[in-house]
């Protein structure tokens, strides 16, 4: 092993791969008449890791032991609390999709169609997390796109083929991998057309985007500029076939429950009819009765609805579910903050009353699980700011008063309890 030396009289040694001298790198490792530096070793390790990951993707999609729907659901349970029916629907749909891909090369009279998925549920109910967890489980390229940023090609904004470009970027422009990936399109409800009737005027960010997405979701050859460039005439494009990409579309669909209720209550007219009041059923129960005609009335075009045959509805998370989300998943928020405080060699205790207060506040804000982190972050801000410069703190206790803003965290200094911010 050749270490760097400061002597001018010594003959300089150079890396045989990058040509850097021993003074430009941390270490030079000697072989028979050759040297390699630490930087080149790191680069080689990175190349090996990338190739191993690529081999893992191919193996995960071609192996005979594709996870069963029950195994997929069990893994979803580790990260997503509640939404049992949605997890079961997703597990079956994803299993069937990748089982279909495994049998593409086999000649058969029956051609299996792709089953893209539509997730309907309020903000913070777990739609995006479900899609992310599925992609991580299957070890396939994954991208999240925001439908509200999309416009028709030729207008200011992103066109739909930018989605495929991002998917390619996520797998280092390996087309075969991208063609078996998962695309999650969020806020799909925000591009609904403004009325039930087809638009007479140009709607470049609503119905126009739906028409553009239709081709992508159904399966087309998307032309993507190489290495993330902009489209220019006479430019070579990367051709990506979207036929086998799984598309998952999600949205809150605020107001859809009213459309469903209006439809279902039409039957309750006349003598002896039993009409349920709208308050008797919660929104989640109503959304489970979603029919294609309701989505058309809401503003999605029939052709796009037809390309999203699997519909899973997610209910609003109640206080008990939000409290479980804080502590039970593998990457639960409370576990994350325990780890952060442990890095300062301090124990963090968040009492059950505090967890309940966090859940209540998230429900009041109508942010669902997505708002939990900001509530905890706000409550712990002062103590996380002061803690690195404090001496002798062994434990921090958070109760419901801290969450509600009526108190401060209790700090344990060896044997003496003190309140954060007190002298």
From Swiss-Prot:
Organism the protein comes from: Burkholderia cenocepacia (strain HI2424)
Residues annotated for ATP binding in this entry: 122-129
PANTHER family: ATP-DEPENDENT CLP PROTEASE ATP-BINDING SUBUNIT CLPX-LIKE, MITOCHONDRIAL, ATP-DEPENDENT CLP PROTEASE ATP-BINDING SUBUNIT CLPX-LIKE, MITOCHONDRIAL-RELATED
Domain ClpX-type ZB: 3-56
Xref: PROSITE patterns: CLPX_ZB
GO biological process: cell division; proteolysis involved in protein catabolic process
Official protein name in the record: ATP-dependent Clp protease ATP-binding subunit ClpX
Keywords tagged on the record: ATP-binding, Chaperone, Metal-binding, Nucleotide-binding, Zinc
């Amino acid at each position: 092993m050749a270490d760097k030396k400061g002597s001018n009289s010594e003959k300089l040694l150079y890396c045989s791969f990058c040509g850097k001298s021993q003074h430009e790198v941390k270490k030079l490792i000697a072989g028979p008449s050759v040297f390699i530096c630490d930087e080149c070793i790191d680069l080689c390790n990175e190349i090996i890791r990338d190739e191993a990951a690529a081999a893992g993707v191919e193996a995960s999609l071609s192996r005979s032991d594709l996870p069963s729907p029950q195994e997929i659901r069990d893994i979803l349970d580790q990260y997503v609390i509640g939404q049992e029916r949605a997890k079961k629907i997703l597990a079956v749909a994803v299993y069937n999709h990748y089982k279909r891909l495994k049998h593409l090369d086999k000649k058969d009279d029956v051609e299996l169609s792709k089953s893209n998925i539509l997730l309907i549920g309020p903000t913070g109910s777990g739609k995006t997390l479900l899609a992310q967890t599925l992609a991580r489980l299957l070890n396939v390229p994954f991208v999240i796109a925001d439908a509200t940023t999309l416009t028709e090609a030729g207008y200011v904004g992103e066109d739909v083929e930018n989605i495929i470009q991002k998917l390619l970027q996520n797998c280092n422009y390996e087309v075969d991998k991208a063609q078996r990936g998962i695309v999650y399109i969020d806020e799909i409800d925000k591009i609904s057309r403004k009325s039930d009737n087809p638009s007479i005027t140009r709607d470049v960010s609503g119905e126009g985007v739906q028409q553009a997405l239709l081709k992508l979701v159904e399966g087309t050859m998307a032309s993507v500029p190489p290495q993330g460039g902009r489209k220019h005439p006479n430019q070579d494009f990367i051709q990506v076939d979207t036929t086998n990409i799984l598309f998952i579309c999600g949205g809150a669909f605020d107001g859809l429950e009213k459309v469903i209720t209006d439809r279902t209550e039409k039957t309750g007219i006349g003598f002896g009819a039993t009409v349920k009041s709208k308050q008797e059923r919660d929104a989640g129960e109503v959304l489970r009765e979603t029919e294609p005609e309701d989505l058309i009335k809401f503003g999605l075009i029939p052709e796009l609805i037809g390309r999203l045959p699997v519909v899973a509805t997610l209910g609003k998370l109640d206080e008990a579910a939000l409290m479980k989300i804080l502590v039970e998943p593998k990457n639960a928020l409370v576990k994350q903050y325990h780890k952060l405080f442990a890095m300062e060699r301090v124990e963090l205790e968040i009492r059950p009353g505090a967890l309940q207060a966090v859940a209540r506040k998230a429900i009041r804000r109508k942010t669902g699980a997505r708002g939990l982190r900001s509530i905890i972050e706000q409550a712990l801000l002062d103590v996380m700011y002061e803690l690195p410069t404090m001496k002798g703190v062994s434990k921090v206790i958070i109760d419901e008063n801290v969450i509600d803003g009526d108190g401060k965290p209790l700090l344990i200094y060896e044997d003496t309890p003190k309140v954060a911010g007190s002298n």
